[in-house]
Amino acid sequence: MLSTLIRKVIGSKNERELKRLWPIVAKINSLEPQMQALSDEELRGKTAEFKERYSKGESLDALLPEAFAVCREGGRRELGMRHFDVQLIGGMTLHAGKIAEMKTGEGKTLVATLAAYLNAISGKGVHVVTVNDYLARRDSEWMGRLYGFLGLTTGVIVHGLDDEQRRANYAADITYGTNNEFGFDYLRDNMKFSLDDYVQRGFNFAVVDEVDSILIDEARTPLIISGPTEESTDKYYVINQIIPRLEQGEVKEVEANTLSGKKKVYTGDFTIDEKAKSATLTEQGVSKVEKLLKIENLYDPRNIETLHHVNQALRAHAMYRRDVDYVVKDGEVLIVDEFTGRLMPGRRWSDGLHQAVEAKEGVRIESENQTLATITFQNYFRMYAKLSGMTGTADTEAEEFHKIYKLDVTVIPTNRPLLRPDYPDVIYKTEQEKFAAVISDIKEHYEKGQPCLVGTISIEKSEVLSELLRKQGIPHFVLNAKQHEKEAEIVAQAGRKKAITIATNMAGRGTDIVLGGNPDSLLKQWRLANPEATAEQAAAMLEQYRQQCAAEHDEVVALGGLHIIGTERHESRRIDNQLRGRSGRQGDPGSSRFYLSLQDDLLRIFGSERVAKIMDFLKIEEGEAITHAMINKSIENAQKKVEAHNFEIRKHLIDYDDVMNKQREVIYTQRREILAGEDIRESFLEMLDDTISDIVKAYAFEKDAPLEWDWESLSETVFRCFSIQLELSREMIARLNADGLQKMLQEQAHESIKRRADELGDELMDHLIRVVMLQAIDVHWKDHLLNIDHLKEGIGLRSYGQKDPKQEYKKEAYQLFMEMIIRIREETVEKVFWVQIEKEEDIEELEEEQVERSRKMFKAITVNDDEHPAEPAKSQKNAGRNEPCPCGSGKKYKKCCGK
C-alpha cells in the first residue's frame, strides 16, 4: 500500500530513469540537422575526431550525444534505417552497463550499434554476443555495413575458424560472436604456450543479445574443455540390460507410531522424483540388482561406481524420453534444448548419463571425459569491465540479474502502443480435449485467413499437433529441432495470410515475424530456385515481392494480425512471454491465448491439485473448459515457485563456482606472467626458497638436537630436489640450527643455479624455467580440476554430519589448491636442476613441441555441474589416444590426460 502510494508520487525507478534520459534524446535530436548537412566523408571523419578527443581525456559519456547522432545518420544513409527516439534510450541503457528490455520487433539489433559504436571509440574492442552462429553472421554483415561506413572494422567469431582468423576478428573494433565461442576461446587461450598464440585481446565491453537466454537459461551449463578417459564402456551395456527387469514403484504415506503419525513406504524396485529428475532404488530394488549383477553388497565402497551407473541408467530409462529430451539421428543421441527446442549437436550430459542413454538406445557409446579447463558463463561474463544486454523479457528476472551480475533492468517504452490483447488461459481436464480445442481455434483462424503461430514445449507435442492438422487438411509448417536449418526462413514468413506455423519453444528467436511476409526472405528463396537469374531479374522480383507483401500486410492487419496459441505453460513466465511477444510488433494488431490441461507437466507436478479441486467444485464435465482469474493466479504462483527454485540452484552454483573462479584467476594470471617473461628468474628463486623452507620444516625440528634430525632422508630430499650432495661433519651439524640450515641450503642452491645460468646463458636459462613452469602448472591444474570434481560429488553428504557443505567445500578446495601450488613449486625446482639441456636447439625443440600441441585444440565439451544433472554438454573434436598429450608432459595422451 505504502510502496504504491510512493510510486504514484515520485514514479517507479524505471520511470525516473526514463525521465533522466529524455533530455539527452532531445539533445541528440537537436544535432540531427547538423549531421544531415555533412558529406559522407565528413560524417566518417567524425569517428577519427571522436578518437582523438577521447585520447585527450574527453569521456565517452561526454561524446555520447554527438556519437549517437553520427551513428543515427550513418544508419539512415547506409541501411535506410533511422534510430527511433526509444532506440536512442535503449542505446544509452546499454552504454550505462544495464539491460534494456525491448519488446519483439523494436529493433534490438539496430539499438546495439549505438552503444557498440560509442564504446569502440576507446579502441579497446566491443563484443556483441548472440545465441547462434546464424545471428552472429547475419548481424555482423548487416550492421557491419554501418560500422564500415563510419570507418570502423567488424569481425565475427563462429565455429570452424582457425586461430589466425579468430585473432584477426578479435582485433576488429567490434566483434560479433556466440557465447560458446567467446568462452571456449578464453579457455583455449589459457592453455597456450605463447602470448603470440592468444586470440582474444581483453574484456572491455560486451553487449549480450537475448541476455536472458545466455545469462539465465544457460547459466547452469559450464563450458568445459576435456579429454577422454581410458575407461571401458562395457559396464553401460551390462547395467542397461538389467534395468527393464526392474519395476517402478511409488512412495506412499501410511499411518505409523511416529511424531508425525505417518511414515513413508516404498513399493517396487525404484521410485522417481520428477521435480528433481532423479530415480532411486528401493531396498527391494537393491537386493534385485545385487542378484542380477552377482555382487554381495551394492553399497560396498568398491561398488559405489556401479551404484552410480545403475542410478544413471534408471534416470535414462524412466526420466529421459526420446523425441522430448533427445532425438536419435545417424546413430547419435542428440540433446534437445529444453528452452528453444533446438538440437544441440556435440553437447553431452555429464556424469555417465549420456552414456546410459546411448546404451538404452543401442547406439555406440562414447567414453566419458576428464576436465582440462572450465568456466561458467556467469564467471566468464563477469570478467568484462562493462556488461550490458538486450532482450524482450528481462523484468521477471530483474532480481537475479541484479544479485548475480549487478545488472539493472530498464524497460524501454515501445515506439508505438502495444495493441495485442492477451486472453485468459483456457484449461481442460485432459490433453486430448486441449488439443481438440487448439485444432478448432487454428481452423477458425485459418478459414478467415488470419496467420497463427502455435507454441509447443517439445518435438513430440509439435508432431502430434502436426498430425492432427494434417488430418484436418490444414497446410502448415513445423519448426522444431529437426528443421533448425530452415527456421529463420519459416519464421520470417509466419505472418503471411493463412500461414500456420508450429514452433517448439520459440525456436527462431532473433528473426522478426512481419505481417504479410518478408520480401527479402522471399527473394532469397526465389534465388535458390533460380540460380541463373540476373541482377536485373532479382531487382524486379524484389519489387514485386515488396508490393505483394505490402498488400498482404494490410489484409492481415484487417484480420487481426498474428494470433499466438500456446499449448502448454512453461516453467518460466519469461518463456511464455517470449512466445506472446512474437505478435503485436511495432504497433501491429495481434492476440494470444494459452490452452492448458491438468495433464500438462507444470500443472501435474506443481499445481494440479488446487486447479483440479476448483474444476470439481465447479462440476466441469469432460470436453468443457474453464477460464477463471483464480486458476490463472494459481498457475502463475506455480511458475513463480519454479522460478524461485531455479534461481536458488543458479545462486548455489555460483557460490560454489566462485571458489574455483578465484583459483582459476590465480593460475591463469600466473601463466600469462610467465609467458610475458615478467621477473621469471625472481619468481623461480622465490619458489626455490619456499621449497627449501618446506624441507627444513619437515626434517629440522627445533625441539630436537641437530644430530637427532633425520639426516639420511634430508640428504636424499636435497639431492633429489636440487642435485646437491650434503657433506657435513658431526661438528658442523652440532653447530647448526634450523635457520642456519636453511641459509646454508639457500646459498648452495642459489650458487648452483648461478653456475647453471653461466653455462647456458641467461636467455636460455629463463627459457628453460618458463617451459618447465608452464608444464608443471598445466599438468597439476588438470589434476586439481579432477580432484575438485571428486570433492563436489561427495560434499553434499557432509550435511548428514551437521556440517555446512558449502563451508566444507570452500575449506577443502582451498587445501587442495595449496597442495597443488606446493606440487607445482617442487616439480618446477626439481626439473630446472635436473633437466639435461646442452644447447639452445634442445629447449627450442621442447618448446616447439609444446606450442604445436597447444595448437591442436582439445575436445571442447560443455557439461553441467554435478549437482544439476539435467543440464547438457557441448563438444568438439580431440587429439587421438596415441598422440602426444596436449598438456606438454611428453607422454602419450592415453597415459596422461586420457587416464
UniProtKB/Swiss-Prot annotation:
Locations listed in the record: Cell inner membrane; Cytoplasm
Enzyme Commission numbers on file: 7.4.2.8
PROSITE patterns, per database record: SECA (PS01312), SECA_MOTOR_DEAD (PS51196)
GO biological process: intracellular protein transmembrane transport; protein import; protein targeting; protein transport by the Sec complex
Cofactor note: May bind 1 zinc ion per subunit.
One MF term in the entry's GO annotations: metal ion binding
Cofactor dependency: Zn(2+)
Residues given in the record as Zn(2+) binding sites: 885, 887, 896-897
Membrane topology: Peripheral membrane protein
Annotated CDD domains: DEXDc_SecA, SF2_C_secA
Key words of the record: ATP-binding, Cell inner membrane, Cell membrane, Cytoplasm, Membrane, Metal-binding, Nucleotide-binding, Protein transport, Translocase, Translocation, Transport, Zinc
UniProt keyword Transport, yes or no: yes
GO cellular component, one term: cytosol
Principal localisation: membrane
Binding site for ATP: 87, 105-109, 512
Broad class of enzyme this protein falls into: translocase
Function statement: Part of the Sec protein translocase complex. Interacts with the SecYEG preprotein conducting channel. Has a central role in coupling the hydrolysis of ATP to the transfer of proteins into and across the cell membrane, serving as an ATP-driven molecular motor driving the stepwise translocation of polypeptide chains across the membrane.
Similarity comment text for this entry: Belongs to the SecA family.
Subunit structure: Monomer and homodimer. Part of the essential Sec protein translocation apparatus which comprises SecA, SecYEG and auxiliary proteins SecDF-YajC and YidC.
Protein name: Protein translocase subunit SecA
Species of provenance: Trichlorobacter lovleyi (strain ATCC BAA-1151 / DSM 17278 / SZ) (Geobacter lovleyi)
Gene assigned in the entry: secA
